């Protein structure tokens, strides 16, 4: 979420539903064996989201189709909104590493299977 927040312009917020993808098993093993909360993991590790492409809504289907055709798993991770018109539903991530950019609302629960 922090990386996404840094690339968004100030005044924008992306919503990211944690249930939108299945977290690879290794991250759940780290969480359970290390007794590490999900929020700590999501602040440190990518939890299976290796790259995010921010595209216009009308380009999302083409972008995911092209990625999949190239053998890269792809899905729509979230939607970008004007921050003033949006009510967060979870943990808001912003201002990371000193970047005054946008923000990300991370909500929902992770799927591990």
Summary of predicted features, one role per range:
Residues 1-113:
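Glycine-/charge-enriched secondary-structure boundary and capping motifs
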């Amino acid at each position: 979420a922090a990386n996404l927040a840094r690339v968004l312009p100030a005044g924008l917020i992306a919503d990211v539903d944690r249930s939108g993808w299945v977290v690879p098993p290794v991250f759940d093993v780290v969480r359970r064996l290390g007794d590490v909360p999900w929020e700590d993991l999501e602040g440190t590790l990518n939890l299976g989201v290796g790259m995010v492409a921010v595209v216009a809504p009308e380009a999302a289907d083409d972008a995911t189709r092209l990625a999949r055709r190239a053998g890269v798993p792809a899905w729509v991770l979230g939607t970008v909104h004007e921050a003033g018109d949006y009510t967060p539903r979870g943990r808001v991530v912003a201002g990371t590493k000193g970047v005054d950019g946008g923000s990300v609302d991370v909500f929902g629960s992770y799927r591990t299977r």
